Amino acid sequence: MAALDPTLLILLVLAGLGIISHNMTVTLAILTLIAVRITPLNQFFPWIEKYGLTIGILILTIGVMTPIASGKISASEVLHSFVQWKSILAIVVGVAVSWLGGRGVSLMTHQPSVVAGLLVGTVLGVALFRGVPVGPLIAAGLLSLVIGKS
């Protein structure tokens, strides 16, 4: 009998947490990684590791910007965001979170040893507190402030 792959076991547990938490994004992402791992597609892991985050951020940015591009948010609404205090505060928070995310990407790139903890924490946050799986970048950014790395 072949020994069970511990990495596969971890992925299965994380997929289970995704299912329990009813988070299809996490579940589908992990099941996709399992499929890649157990098929000849596993040769693409280096490429996925190198470009996956960038592609994910690109897709997320497209999703966030679509209401402006489609006209659902008009040009006048965008311009008004610079004069209303709540919108100005939203801009400041957006800048801060983007900055933290940038620090997070840098930390995750230069200190891969923290990635596992950040991922487990994010999946637990999604599973137990109905969070969303954008947490690793922001969490890594906050961690970089605590440990003094960028």
From Swiss-Prot:
Any one GO cellular component localisation term in the record:
plasma membrane
* Source taxonomy: Bacteria, Pseudomonadati, Pseudomonadota, Gammaproteobacteria, Enterobacterales
UniProtKB keywords: Cell membrane, Membrane, Transmembrane, Transmembrane helix
Its record classes its membrane topology as:
Multi-pass membrane protein
* Residue ranges of the TM segments: 1-21, 51-71, 88-108, 114-134
Q: What is this protein called?
A: UPF0756 membrane protein YE1142
What InterPro entries does its record include? UPF0756_TM (IPR007382)
Q: Which locations, inside or outside the cell, does it occupy? A: Cell membrane
Could you tell me which Pfam families the record lists for this protein? Answer: DUF441
Superkingdom of origin organism = Bacteria
Can you tell me which family this protein belongs to? Answer: Belongs to the UPF0756 family.
Coiled-coil regions listed: none
Question: Does the keyword field hold NADP?
Answer: no
